[in-house]
């Protein structure tokens, strides 16, 4: 509902989870977008893994919630949906924390820097082999994560 954006966001999140469970029940392949900030992802990912799903993560990193807030402001000016600044800040912290918390669950992951016009691959892990392509940026991210623990 346009006058109750938080209620609409909660309802939308529940619908996404229902759809994921339905796809998994049918054994269908699927992808979904998330901030990775929710509390239920560890259980969901473990459940999908136990059903034989291969899990692949593309994580888009930005250095600050302020950049996300500025991008949201631009999106709203173009007719997109608004996200309150306090939600952005909370999700920023949780999303980064959960990337490092859950990264071992994924069969593969790619970590992109997303502060420029196009995403830039910083690090990746495939078949258990991790490779850091941009050490300076990767250690900046690890340092940010360490302050959030």
Describe each model-derived feature in a short phrase:
Residues 102-149:
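NTP-dependent small-molecule kinase module
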Residues 32-42, 62:
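Acidic, metal-coordinating catalytic cores used for nucleic-acid/nucleotide bond scission
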Residues 8, 12-16, 37-40, 68, ...:
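Helical mechanochemical/support elements of P-loop NTPase systems and associated helical scaffolds
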Residues 43-47:
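A short acidic, amphipathic alpha-helical/loop segment
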Residues 23, 48, 102-103:
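A generic structural signal for well-ordered alpha-helical segments
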Residues 53-98:
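A glycine- and Lys/Arg-enriched "phosphate-lid" helix/loop adjacent to the NTP-binding pocket
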Residues 1-28:
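Conserved substrate/cofactor phosphate-moiety recognition/catalytic segment
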Residues 27, 51-56, 105-108:
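Short glycine-/polar-rich loops that comprise or flank the Walker A/P-loop
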């Amino acid at each position: 509902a346009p006058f109750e954006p938080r209620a609409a966001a909660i309802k939308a999140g529940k619908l996404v989870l229902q759809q994921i469970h339905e796809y998994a029940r049918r054994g269908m392949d699927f992808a979904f977008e998330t901030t990775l900030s929710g509390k239920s992802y560890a259980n969901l990912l473990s459940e999908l893994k136990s059903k034989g799903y291969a899990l692949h993560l593309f994580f888009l990193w930005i250095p600050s919630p302020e950049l996300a807030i500025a991008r949201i402001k631009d999106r709203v000016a173009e007719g997109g949906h608004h996200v309150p600044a306090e939600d952005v800040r909370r999700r920023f912290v949780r999303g980064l924390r959960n990337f490092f918390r859950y990264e071992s669950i994924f069969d593969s992951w790619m970590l992109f820097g997303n502060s420029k016009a196009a995403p830039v691959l910083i690090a990746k892990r495939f078949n258990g082999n991790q490779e850091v392509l941009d050490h300076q940026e990767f250690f900046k991210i690890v340092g940010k994560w360490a302050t959030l623990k």
